Amino acid sequence: MPALNLIFRPGRNRVFGRACSLFLAVAIARCGGLSGQTSTNLPPPSPPPATQSTCATPAASNPVGGGGTYTQIAIDPGVYGKRDTSELTVFGFSQQDQNLPADPQVLAMSPNIVPRAWARWDRSGVQPSDYNFDYPKQAQAAGITFIAGTTATALFRDEFPAASKFNAVVSCDATGQPVFHSAMKFYRGSLASPAYRQYLIGIGEMQIDGGVDGLFFDEVDFSYQGAISGNEDNGDEGFDDADIADFGGFLCGKYPNYSPAEWQSKYGITAADNLNCSKPAATRGRTFNYRGYLARNGWQASPLTASNPLAAEWGTIIGGHPEPQNGTFTGTYTSLVYWQDIALTLRNYARQKYKKEIYITANGVFPFVDFQTIGLWGGNPDGPGGSSVNYCPHTADGHLDGKQSLLAAFMAMKQRSARIDGRVVPVAAFIDWPTDVMTDYLSLPSSEKSDYWRMYVPEALAATVYLNMHLADTMGDPTAKQSGLMPLFQQTTAFYKMPTHAALYHNTRDLPGRVTASVANIGANLTQLSDERTVAHLINHNYSQGFQEQDGVSVSFPVAKAPRSVTLVSPDYRADTPLAFTYSGGQVRVTVPKLVAYVAVVSEN
C-alpha cells in the first residue's frame, strides 16, 4: 500500500504495529509526505467539508440481471486476463515517485517483474506530465515487467475541488456525512459511485497510454473502513447514496419474493423506508432509505450493531480479504460488481486501443486478477482460525527467529486465492509498509536481513508463492543497496531466472506425501510438475544468528515409480548436482550432502 495510507486495518493501528496518531503525523513530516512525495507536492491539511446531505451519486440501475448474491451477479468473461504469467518467477519490490529516473537497483537486479513501481497518490499521478514514461521503457528493454497503479479509495479533497463533484464520489457515514480520516487527512472514495470508478479508470488508462505492462490497485475494499475519534475502522462508512441504492437492489435480488409484511417482520422495514421490490429488476430496491431506517431505530452512530437485523446483510470487510461468496452486500458488490467493472473496462481499453493484454493485480486476494499481490502486515487474519501470522519472526533479543517456518502461511495464501478467484493464478507477497513487519525486518542486522531472504524466498517458492525481494519504498527506509543486499539479490535473481530452475516453481501440484528428513527443524513440501517430475523442497530452519549447516541429511519421499535420475538444485551450490538414490516400497531415498538454506531434490521419472 502506498506509503502511509495502509496504516489502519480493521481493529488495529498499523503504524509500526501500534504507534499513536501523533507519531504518525511526525513520521509523515519526517518522510516528506505520503507515498514519498515531498511536502511541497501535498496540499495543506483540509478540514471536513461543510455539512451536506448528498454523497456518492448512485448508478442509474442495478447490475445486469438485477443484482443480488454472488450466484446472481453476471461475470463478463472478458474480465479475465490472457497474458502469460509463466515467466514471472523473480519479483522485486521497488516503488518510487512517478517522475523520478529509473531505480538503478531494479535495472541491476533485473527481476522478472516489479509489481508496483508507481502508485498514484492524491494529485501526484493524475496528469501525463507527472510521469517519467521512459522508466517502463528501460525496464521492458531489460526484460522486466513494469506494473504501475494507484490507490483505489484514499481520496483527498483537492482531487475534486468543486463541492458538487467531490460529493458525487465521496463515501459517507450513516448520518450522510463524509468520513474524514484525520490521521491521514483524507476521505474515502466510494467504489459504488460510477463517477469515482471512472476517475480510477481514467488514471489507469493514462498509465496504459504511457506503456506500462499492468496496473496495481491498493486498498480496493477500504470504502467501508469508518473513522471516529478513538475508534478507527469502526465500519461506519460506505453508507453513501450510491452504496445504499445498490444495497436496496441487493436485498430485492436476494429476497425477491418477500412481501411487505415479511420485510417488516424480519427486518422492521416499513413503507416509510421506501424499499420497493415490485419494480423491474433494473430499478428494484434503489429508493431504499437505509440511512432513514438507521436513524429511526437509533442506529446511526453504530450501524453495524447486532441490534440492527440488516447489519448481517450489509456485512463487514477485512481489508484485502474479500469474501464474495459470503452472501453479504459488501462482500458481494465490492468484488464482483465494482472491482469487476474497473478491471473489465481497463482490460478492454488496452485490447481495443493497443491490441494487447495487461496485467491487473491488487493488494490482497481478489477475483479477476492475473496474479495476487499480498501485502504482509501485522494483525493479519492469515493464520488458523483468523489468528495473526508473524511474517518477520524475532527472538526475544531482537534477532531473526529463523526456527519459525512460514510454509503453512504461504500455502494458505495459495489456497485462499483459489477459493476466492475460482482459478489457479500466481500468488505473490511483499512486505507491506509502513507496518510492524517492515519495522521488524529493518531492525535486523545486515547479515540477518540477507538470511531472511535466503530462507523465506525459497520457502515461499516451495509453496509456489513468489516473495518480493525488497529494494525500495517511498518512506526513506534504507534501500537494498544501502543495506548491502544487492549482491545477494542479483545472485538470487540469476539463479531463479535460469529456465531449468524457474520451471520448478510453475504449474505445480502439491502432493499429500510426506517428506522425511533425518534432522529436525526442516521445512518441507512435496510438489509435482506438469512434466510429472516430483520435487521435495527442503528449507533449513536450524538457525541462530546464522544458518547452522546440516551435512549428510537422509531424506525420503514417495513417488509412483522408480525415477531415472535425482538432482539437487540449490542457490547454495555451485551447480546442479546429480545424486545417487535408492528406491523401494514407493519411496525415494537420498542423502543430501549439504543443506545450508534450501535444497530442491528433483526426481525425474
What are the residue ranges of the model-derived segments?
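Glycine-rich, aromatic-flanked loop segments that form ligand/cofactor-binding clefts
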Residues: 131-184, 214-224
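Catalytic domains of carbohydrate-active enzymes, especially glycoside hydrolases
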Residues: 90-127, 206, 210-212
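Catalytic-core region of carbohydrate-active enzymes that cleave or remodel glycosidic bonds
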Residues: 344-470
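C-terminal beta-strand-rich structural cap/linker in extracellular carbohydrate-active enzymes
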Residues: 584-605
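Carbohydrate-binding surface patches
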Residues: 458-459, 515-562, 599
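Bacterial Sec-dependent N-terminal signal peptides
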Residues: 22, 26-57, 61
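Polysaccharide-binding and catalytic clefts of secreted carbohydrate-active enzymes
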Residues: 181-371, 375-380, 395-399, 403
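Boundary/entry segment of secreted carbohydrate-active catalytic domains
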Residues: 53-106
